[in-house]
Amino acid sequence: MKKIGVLALQGAVDEHIQMIESAGALAFKVKHSNDLAGLDGLVLPGGESTTMRKIMKRYDLMEPVKAFAKEGKAIFGTCAGLVLLSKEIEGGEESLGLLEATAIRNGFGRQKESFEAELTVEVFDDSPFEAVFIRAPYLIEPSDEVSVLATVENRIVAAKQANILVTAFHPELTNDNRLMKYFLEKMV
């Protein structure tokens, strides 16, 4: 059975663990770099990207997460996870630099502009994915290496590149585990 870690610094950690388990894998909380040992994949949950980055630096997790990805292990970032995984963040904040695109933080607005939308996701059949956007980012300027999986208002809200999968929305806050199953079956 595949072993997936969830970076447990803040955000919807328990919801991701439930989603991983519902998709048929074992889930583990990751708080320190040694927690990455033996994992097949990693989830970077939503939360506040600046705070998450500061905590990752405090616990010396930035370089170990980069090394995890460079070993070819899969990483799934949602919302703040998308921001942290991007090569660049608008405004010049430090990132992990693992996805060849630029992240626009809070691209759809602040908390009061949060919304839900039915998305067509390229890797699914025709049934829409009910997506929850909370202070959501989006991506711009993807390289040719990046596959766009979904857009809202012509803004990139889901993408993948090699072993990296990102969404601007929160699949863990729905009952639809198709994205987690895709991550487990196609990327891990």
From Swiss-Prot:
In the presence of PdxS, forms a dodecamer of heterodimers. Only shows activity in the heterodimer. The active site is at 79 (nucleophile), 170 (charge relay system), 172 (charge relay system). Pathway: Cofactor biosynthesis; pyridoxal 5'-phosphate biosynthesis. L-glutamine binds at residues 47-49, 105, 134-135. This is Pyridoxal 5'-phosphate synthase subunit PdxT. It catalyses: aldehydo-D-ribose 5-phosphate + D-glyceraldehyde 3-phosphate + L-glutamine = pyridoxal 5'-phosphate + L-glutamate + phosphate + 3 H2O + H(+); L-glutamine + H2O = L-glutamate + NH4(+). HAMAP family: PdxT. NCBIfam families: PLP_synth_Pdx2. GO terms for molecular function: glutaminase activity; pyridoxal 5'-phosphate synthase (glutamine hydrolysing) activity. PANTHER family: PYRIDOXAL 5'-PHOSPHATE SYNTHASE SUBUNIT SNO, PYRIDOXAL 5'-PHOSPHATE SYNTHASE SUBUNIT SNO1-RELATED. The lineage of its organism: Bacteria, Bacillati, Bacillota, Bacilli, Bacillales. One of its GO terms (cellular component) is cytosol. The gene is pdxT. Its EC number is 4.3.3.6, 3.5.1.2. Keywords: Glutamine amidotransferase, Hydrolase, Lyase, Pyridoxal phosphate. Belongs to the glutaminase PdxT/SNO family. The keyword Cell wall biogenesis/degradation does not apply. It comes from the Bacteria. Catalyzes the hydrolysis of glutamine to glutamate and ammonia as part of the biosynthesis of pyridoxal 5'-phosphate. The resulting ammonia molecule is channeled to the active site of PdxS. It comes from Listeria innocua serovar 6a (strain ATCC BAA-680 / CLIP 11262).
